[in-house]
């Protein structure tokens, strides 16, 4: 991978971390099954997503930190960052460029996937 490619991946990773950790730079979406949980449970799930750091080749093959999963009270929770065009109609042509990308972080049960 060229230095330019590495720089792009580093930018994508940073932008994904900003959204996941601080809610900056995109939308956070919860599926119905997550929204149906208590406020306390939702807060606990958000904290687990925010502090998630178990990234490895199996769940992060491109080093973008765009996916994670964990167990919560016997259920598997999954979160995923997706990249869209600014009008949200198509995929983003360049997820490293904020002017060309609208990010969403979706938090869901594995069974919602």
Mark where each language-model region is.
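Compact soluble domain cores
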Residues: 7-70
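Short, compact, well-ordered microdomains
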Residues: 66-113
């Amino acid at each position: 991978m060229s230095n330019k490619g590495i720089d792009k991946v580093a930018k994508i990773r940073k932008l994904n971390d900003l959204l996941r950790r601080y809610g900056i730079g995109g939308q956070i979406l919860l599926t119905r099954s997550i929204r149906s949980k208590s406020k306390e449970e939702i807060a606990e799930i958000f904290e687990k997503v925010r502090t998630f750091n178990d990234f490895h080749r199996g769940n992060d093959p491109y080093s973008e930190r765009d996916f994670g999963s964990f167990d919560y009270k016997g259920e598997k929770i999954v979160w995923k960052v997706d990249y869209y065009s600014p009008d949200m109609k198509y995929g983003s042509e360049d997820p490293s460029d904020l002017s060309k990308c609208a990010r969403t972080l979706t938090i869901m049960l594995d069974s919602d996937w």
